[in-house]
Amino acid sequence: MVSGVGGSGGGRGGGRGGEEEPSSSHTPNNRRGGEQAQSSGTKSLRPRSNTESMSKAIQQYTVDARLHAVFEQSGESGKSFDYSQSLKTTTYGSSVPEQQITAYLSRIQRGGYIQPFGCMIAVDESSFRIIGYSENAREMLGIMPQSVPTLEKPEILAMGTDVRSLFTSSSSILLERAFVAREITLLNPVWIHSKNTGKPFYAILHRIDVGVVIDLEPARTEDPALSIAGAVQSQKLAVRAISQLQALPGGDIKLLCDTVVESVRDLTGYDRVMVYKFHEDEHGEVVAESKRDDLEPYIGLHYPATDIPQASRFLFKQNRVRMIVDCNATPVLVVQDDRLTQSMCLVGSTLRAPHGCHSQYMANMGSIASLAMAVIINGNEDDGSNVASGRSSMRLWGLVVCHHTSSRCIPFPLRYACEFLMQAFGLQLNMELQLALQMSEKRVLRTQTLLCDMLLRDSPAGIVTQSPSIMDLVKCDGAAFLYHGKYYPLGVAPSEVQIKDVVEWLLANHADSTGLSTDSLGDAGYPGAAALGDAVCGMAVAYITKRDFLFWFRSHTAKEIKWGGAKHHPEDKDDGQRMHPRSSFQAFLEVVKSRSQPWETAEMDAIHSLQLILRDSFKESEAAMNSKVVDGVVQPCRDMAGEQGIDELGAVAREMVRLIETATVPIFAVDAGGCINGWNAKIAELTGLSVEEAMGKSLVSDLIYKENEATVNKLLSRALRGDEEKNVEVKLKTFSPELQGKAVFVVVNACSSKDYLNNIVGVCFVGQDVTSQKIVMDKFINIQGDYKAIVHSPNPLIPPIFAADENTCCLEWNMAMEKLTGWSRSEVIGKMIVGEVFGSCCMLKGPDALTKFMIVLHNAIGGQDTDKFPFPFFDRNGKFVQALLTANKRVSLEGKVIGAFCFLQIPSPELQQALAVQRRQDTECFTKAKELAYICQVIKNPLSGMRFANSLLEATDLNEDQKQLLETSVSCEKQISRIVGDMDLESIEDGSFVLKREEFFLGSVINAIVSQAMFLLRDRGLQLIRDIPEEIKSIEVFGDQIRIQQLLAEFLLSIIRYAPSQEWVEIHLSQLSKQMADGFAAIRTEFRMACPGEGLPPELVRDMFHSSRWTSPEGLGLSVCRKILKLMNGEVQYIRESERSYFLIILELPVPRKRPLSTASGSGDMMLMMPY
């Protein structure tokens, strides 16, 4: 559906003409391509591989490029563009010249035109000199061109002009501050004024390859304060909409989508707002709509995948909001410096003009203006998506698109608020999708269990004759079971004669497979497909034995597709040649003709799992008939092993009890009735209640304050059901005279206690005493006592505190915050809390974290307090800080809410130790853990010997070559020691993994990793090509040398293991110097480790990008190295090209720079910038 993308400027339907790759070097391999509805054929029973998905994506790119060329040629020849015919004649098998694809990407990315509602200026970042501008810039800025420019009076707006001369002095200062920011987009919009006219503009900045692009959109007020207030008001409206989303009952994605379109329409005022969902086969569907009553409905509309090209979808993950003000407006040319080698990239510009075909489509459907917003969710790394490119797992789920029947311009602050709403919608949607997936997995597992139980208790026919049946496992129209030559059909299924013909075809053409799935039997090559007709188009079959088969069938797709606008009325003038939603719908129906809904990955997983279970069940049933005597002998051995395991677990349990009793944090436990059965020394000290007195008391009735009873009751009931909660505040009574009846506040984590049968028998609470902080916060919020004395006291009991006014500007930043973050009060006061303070100064972990923080802050300003919100961030030196945020409304003496107070709580080492003790209760991998611990222990002795030998060699007289060899040996020994000494993989997951910081030379790392690969290179007959400039080896950088060495060695050895024998392996290293925002220097290093051919198998690459699961030790090693690299703010990609495959590792490393500290000691210490 061309209009579908609205502002995206994408295909015939909204995809074409706008959002393509940032550069032509971003090949189709760089995005996840789903299996197209247009293509079919046979697939293995296992879910489709990522290689197959990438192949489909490449095919999609070629189709997109061909359609683009047809449209361009029709314009040049004066002929009309026949939309439907072009779709029919453009096939997936046809090849497209590479230059045609490059031209297609470049045409839209570097089109050279903008929309006329604003103007654009491109600037060299280092000199502020203009390198390009739109032709309407002079008019919008009120600059009159010189009739005859001279040296004394040069042209005011010309190439080489300092852009600061066009704006007021205060505006120039704001631009200078933005240009040095690490993330320039976080400061958008910058409020600036034209020097000639004083007219205000929103300056929206982003970096490109040749400089900085400044998009200038006219603002509606001349007071910057009003602009800030307007932006905050837009954010408040978005927060209100987000609150409505969060208040919805869970488990209803349709209701969530319906609510978001209503919210967006209320927020923006567009005539129509829709939610587009991209299906697994990449075609789109309108799943929710809010519109003006007189407009034609689009709800239920489906459109082919080609309507929104792959390039457009990729770019929506980069530029998430796109507005077209008037599709009929004449675009404005961008002129640029002649010295630039190619047209400027306008992908990130808010003003970029739509492509002609998209404007034409919008006009055909009566839509003049549009706003398109990406809905991004976290892709499931475990499903293997995105692993081939090595990219992170952000996935474009769909779009929210707004249409208007007249021109409409939404100011940037409101668009930013909409983006904010979309991020929250994506988070909420992601949770709902995960919940739906979990529910589906549970349902499938339950069905599988019941089916297997039927199979063992009754005859095999029970899985089709009883309920549930195999039809309940996946969505289908029919199913069948062929068992020992007897046929059991269900629902819409072929006849017995037809199914035997299908089996003969399977055994003749797919005998070496374990099964097959297809959405079109005809395209899969089955000669009898026509006889089956539309009733049986798609089929999935699982081979149980050589003579037993399970089948599932699906009818053609078109019968399930309903759209209210599909009916063609006589007065409608459009036809198949014109680009229109009705044309898109008919094209989609043509594409899916004689084709069923594709089999989804989760469905293939369910079928394959049932296949394995049934195979094992059949084998066990047969084996049970002949092995009863053997079983009787073996069983006592299993019992003895069980007793030994119980003894070991008992020893562990006794050790756990001892650790809990002596812990320095409060720990207590209750049985299933809520009565105390555990009470350690610390909680006894805090409450004045001894262990003997506490035992048997009711936690809720006897020990908790009445106002806290509801919270604790809820916490208990959820934990007894297995739902464990964290960071819940509990208010406990005290019982000793010394405590004078004062309350004790403890923040607890609830942990379900289980017996040896895994039944929940109680709840254990691990807590942290926050009484002192609570008292301070209560006084502070109520403005009791001396305000300044509390906030700025150096007393360690005063927590880190910051405050925001009603416009989210920072107005308080106490000493504890200065110490925690490294940023002084004077540096942050007056800046925007969200974006500037937290975002630019203190970086957060991604846009989702920024969105969640903004919601919390605005909720507090709106009067809704938040307690113990997880708030991790990076301090000034790049150190990762884990904190809990409490945000409270800030109230004036008159009781009016005037902002927010925020308190940070840093978990104490004691609490972290207690949580580590809690995690040790997991004994599933107890035996393997013991073996690993044994290996790590005994390997330390020879390591110690190696270290001693190396130290002796260091004291001898060595030449330069010998010194280098010794240095390499020492580095490898240190690498082993670090790996053996730090086995806590969970700390890598949660970001608390400690990275050391030291100066080192890149050449030392290269020597160490090459030395580890030499034996394997010789064994496999491989030539090592080192493309490393000598000057790079001598560069001194700052970071964790051993960890960098570890992960680079792992990636290199993996490449070597899977390189073809007697071939080559290449190491390429390049670097680019970079100036950081604080004036420090850094280098961006790119390591490329390549080999010819396909390289690593897809299963291993999938293991590498798993978030939690792995199937091989080598996959685990790659996964751990990827996560360590991520903690260093680096990234790794695995890229397959036509003739080679390679790892691309990107890491920024600061160059040590000495700067004297302003201390009285004058000891010559250094301040070093650290990236992580």
Curated annotation (Swiss-Prot):
Effect recorded for residue 1072 to V: In strain: cv. Kas-1
Range of residues in the leader sequence: none
Composition bias, Gly residues: 1-16
Region feature Disordered, mapped onto this chain: 1-54
Effect of residue 143 to L: In strain: cv. Kas-1
Domain PAS per the UniProt entry, residue ranges: 652-723, 786-857
Compartment annotation: Cytoplasm; Nucleus, Nucleoplasm; Nucleus speckle; Nucleus
Triggers of expression: Inactivation is proportional to temperature in the dark.
Any one GO molecular function term: red or far-red light photoreceptor activity
Chief location of this protein within or outside the cell: cytoplasm
Subunit structure comment from the entry: Homodimer. Interacts with ADO1 and PKS4. Stabilized by interactions with PAPP5 and FYPP3 which are enhanced in the phosphorylated Pfr form. Interacts with VOZ1 and VOZ2. Binds, via its photosensory domain, to PTAC12/HMR/PAP5 when photoactivated; this interaction stimulates its localization to photobodies. Interacts with CRY1 specifically when in the dark/far-red (Pr) state, but not when red light-activated (Pfr). Interacts with PIF4 and PIF5 in response to low blue light (LBL). Component of a red light-dependent nuclear complex made of PHL, PHYB and CO. Interacts directly with PHL.
PANTHER family on file: OS08G0260000 PROTEIN, PHYTOCHROME 1
Name the UniProt record assigns to this protein: Phytochrome B
Organism: Arabidopsis thaliana (Mouse-ear cress)
